[in-house]
Amino acid sequence: VFLYLLLLHFKLPVFYSVIISIGITFLSPQLARMPGHFSLSYVFAIPAMLYLIAKFDQRNRYCISVIIGLFVLWALGTHVYMLGFHASIIMLYWIFKFLYNKETCKNRKNYLHLAIQFIGPLIIFIAFTAFTDPVSDRTAYPWGFLFYRAYPESIFLPLGKPYAQFLLNFSDFKYINWEGIAFVGIVASIGFLIAIVFFIIYIAKNRLKSFPQPSEKYMMNVFFWASLIMLLYSFGIPFIIGDASQLIHYLGPLKQMRGIARFSWLFFYMINIFIFYHIWNLRKKGLNRVIWVILLVLTTSFLYYDAYINVRFWSKQVNNSIPALNDHQNRTDENMWLKEIDISNFQATIPIPYFHVGSENIWVNATCGITRPTYLVSWKTGLPTMGVMLSRTSISQTLENIELFNEPYRRPAILNKLIPGKSYLIVTIDDCIDIPPIQKKMIDKSIVLYQSDDFSLYECPWDSLVSVHNNPFYEILFEINEEELFAYGDYLTDHSVMNFQIESFSENSGDDYYIIPGSYSVRLQKGSWIYHKDIPNFEAGTEYIISFWVNDLRKDLFMRSRFELQLRDSLNQGHDAWKPELFRNVKAFDGNWALIERSFHFKNPGDIIRWHITNNDLRRTEYTVSHIMIRPSHTNIYRKGDGWLMKNNRFFMP
């Protein structure tokens, strides 16, 4: 409706406005958000703001400003990206107005209008969020700012369209994330190319003595240039130029809107309005009537064909019928499991394999298709789930959740926040092979309730959940006292030959260390390597494990640092390298310390290990390493301390 009204505002006839507005609506990239990010699929949101601003410019009424302000509040409560769209329209409108009309700057009423339209609603939203959000440690650096960006190809090329398969002969376009696709339509693409040609001719003739006006409509020009600015921003400009990516750190809260490709949507609407407006007005500029009619038919047909392809594709995604959910009375065979369990016995569901995505610091990705049965069981039972698939979750809460499903070490803090004595409902897939040992142990200690090819349900009693995290201190003490071990300095090993290396940094005594005094601090920048050579009784081809404790686990962005490990020969030439994110090698947590562990294979006698942790976004930040251990995977290393026992770099206390 608002597209139609906007076209009428620009003096296009009713029947043409109806036809074009329908075509643009069904071509909209916002339809792609119906299968997910549903609140971003409100196709009216951007055209409505364009229409309201156009009407405000025409009438300059406070009532329109109030409507705009209320609309911004609605946008803020719907999805924060809606604020981004509306803010870009409102603020760029006022910037153009202030720049090109000096009288506007002098009129104090205009500042009041701006306050009503945008500043006031924004302040209300910030205040409301500050008073209602109990979480204070969400990430300030969400991942993907330059990954979820648009490309000229994703905007102007008909990628994936039946008539453009030949484009795959030039590139597979795999570097384009689906978030970046906002095809404007073949008509708008060709029209924009022609507009660029005319723009170049204009510059050649006028040498930019006056600012180019794409149309005779002032507001269309304002919206066009505003949309073009946002298109460039969606490409990642200026951040993709040289080393300008560091500028992202100065964006403040704007960093939270990491899906910058979405800002190309404003351009999608405006370039289509702009092109079809000019096509209609070609007749007034002297184009032959027959040619004009043919052009109208062809361009409108192509618009509808592109729209049809878009709708046909996304309709299949939206029509995602799940029979089990459609059975509201739970009478079908696939919902019979509900009659076999007493929901009141459980406090939540636990998906195994466990998944937790959302903190932007640590990812535990879902495997074995566990998300579908997890959501299904949670939906049917009404039980909350401990599985997480969100964004901007609390970093501390994330660590508490993940700690429960990591290998046993310290008693998980989250156990003190759960309801003691009440069971958990485990949702799992029996033939999944990607289940970590501790989670397998949870299943082994649970009671089978239901099994099928799709998923299985187990009752995990409270005592069973707690027992998998029992302190192994006395088990390790038994191993030390009863097994045949060999002493090498302060350490004991079950191997008769010393074949491990310890770096405790004992010469660097200070307050910042883990259990054993000694640590090493260095900046998160390239070049600060830690070397290990002359491994005793080196065994080529044997699996080795390097482990160490590192501080700053809870610092935002730190666990996204890269742990770069290299193997180099005796001539210092590299032959193997790994560069995973730090969180992918975390084995245990303890306060602000994390145990990092990775396996590798030596290949040649005299191989040297070197490694460091880097983070371009935290390059001036120091990290602290404590107690590095390199050992063959078949060898266990022990040590007794004052009130603690160590096994394979894990320190246990009674």
Task: List each language-model region with its residue ranges.
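Membrane-embedded helix bundles of polyisoprenyl
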Residues: 1-10, 15-57, 61-98, 117-125, ...
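Extracellular carbohydrate recognition and processing domains
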Residues: 573-608, 618-620
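Signature aromatic-anchored transmembrane alpha helix within multi-pass, membrane-resident enzymes
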Residues: 91, 118-119, 273, 279-308
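Hydrophobic alpha-helical membrane-interfacial segments at the cytosolic entry of transmembrane helices
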Residues: 71, 105-131, 142-147, 222-227
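Membrane-helix boundary/interfacial segments in multi-pass membrane proteins
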Residues: 32-40, 151, 170-176, 180, ...
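Extracytoplasmic
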Residues: 305-531, 539-541, 614-622, 630-638, ...
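Periplasmic/ER-lumenal interhelical loops and adjacent helix-loop junctions
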Residues: 124-200, 606
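Perimembrane helix-loop-helix junctions
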Residues: 84-119, 199-209
